[in-house]
Amino acid sequence: MAQTVPPCELPCKEYDVARNTGAYTSSGLATASFRTSKYLLEEWFQNCYARYHQAFADRDQSERQRHESQQLATETQALAQRTQQDSTRTVGERLQDTHSWKSELQREMEALAAETNLLLAQKQRLERALDATEVPFSITTDNLQCRERREHPNLVRDHVETELLKEAELIRNIQELLKRTIMQAVSQIRLNREHKETCEMDWSDKMEAYNIDETCGRHHSQSTEVQAHPYSTTFQESASTPETRAKFTQDNLCRAQRERLASANLRVLVDCILRDTSEDLRLQCDAVNLAFGRRCEELEDARYKLHHHLHKTLREITDQEHNVAALKQAIKDKEAPLHVAQTRLYLRSHRPNMELCRDAAQFRLLSEVEELNMSLTALREKLLEAEQSLRNLEDIHMSLEKDIAAMTNSLFIDRQKCMAHRTRYPTILQLAGYQ
């Protein structure tokens, strides 16, 4: 507050003025007709005295006002300088505060950009891993389709098919998991970029405010670019307070840091998912390959046994054919003695009169015929049995050959088709998205 000189009353001054009261005065010569329109001499003196006094008072008041004005100008000049210096210092402090916030925002933006790039790399790994699962899935489905072409009785739901179905289900589940994780990564990348953009806008505002305050800090009373802005002192309704301004930036930083932490956690999760899924796929691939190997060993062993039985069956067929031929020859050999005995009986039936006797020779011939018939019956039954056995052997021979052919076909499918195709299975690095 400027100090002023307090007002005070002027001292009374006496003035020595010569009065016109001599012998030749005209004070008494006034006529009655002019008396009313003229002043008295005393009035004239009083008027002069009043003018003198008024002039002195005005000069004295002017001197006091000049003194007060000079003093006020000096004080206001000093006050203006102090105020300007204080404002410059305050603007400088604000510059430091703005620079501090700007630096924190800059660091957070750089950290968020780096984190986003790392998450983008993880997303690309997920996409490569998802693409890599297409090869195992096509291999598995091709194996299942190829094994559908196995012939009876080898078209069975064996351990290999069970493992292949488990592998197909595992691949489908992993593909769904990778797709969900990719969508989660895309969403997190979008959030990272949104918060980075928010920090960039805040940083840009602070950069502009910093430049403005820096320009303000360089202004002084001798600056030529300053102008009068009478309405600049009006507060804007949208103006923030230091507390709300700091809270706004702090909230932006906290949200950005929170998303950056969530992004880092997601990257760790992606690493775990890719490691686990690639290991699970390779373990299941090894399980399928092991099942194929065991199944091929079983087929090889079964085919070897079938070949062994086929060899024995062929030998038995040969022996049985010889047996059938021998039985036929034996039957043929029994026909001549039977015909002899029957001829003898026939001829002896023509003996005359008492010579037609049932003698020992007759009974022996009858028993011979009966024995020969029984032998022929037994031989014919045995021949039928031998022929049926031969037919059975021929049937089993055909069945064995069909089974061997089916086993050979199954071995070809499992070994030459399926296992050869499975050599194209991706490596663990490809399944983990590194290649």
From Swiss-Prot:
It comes from Homo sapiens. InterPro entries: Tektin-like, Tektins. Ubiquitinated, leading to its degradation. Deubiquitinated by USP16, promoting its stability. This is Tektin-4. Microtubule inner protein (MIP) part of the dynein-decorated doublet microtubules (DMTs) in cilia and flagellar axoneme. Forms filamentous polymers in the walls of ciliary and flagellar microtubules. Contributes to normal sperm motility. One of its GO terms (cellular component) is axonemal A tubule inner sheath. Residues 102-180, 310-336, 363-411 form a coiled coil. Its main location: cytoplasm. Residues 70-85 have a biased composition (Low complexity). Keywords: Cell projection, Cilium, Cilium biogenesis/degradation, Coiled coil, Cytoplasm, Cytoskeleton, Flagellum, Ubl conjugation. Residues 60-96 are annotated as: Disordered. The keyword 4Fe-4S does not apply. Signal peptide: none annotated. Microtubule inner protein component of sperm flagellar doublet microtubules. It is found in: Cytoplasm, Cytoskeleton, Cilium axoneme; Cytoplasm, Cytoskeleton, Flagellum axoneme. It comes from the Eukaryota. Belongs to the tektin family. GO terms for biological process: cilium assembly; cilium movement involved in cell motility; flagellated sperm motility. Strongly expressed in spermatozoa. Also detected at low levels in pancreas. Expressed in airway epithelial cells. Pfam families: Tektin. The keyword Lipid metabolism does not apply.
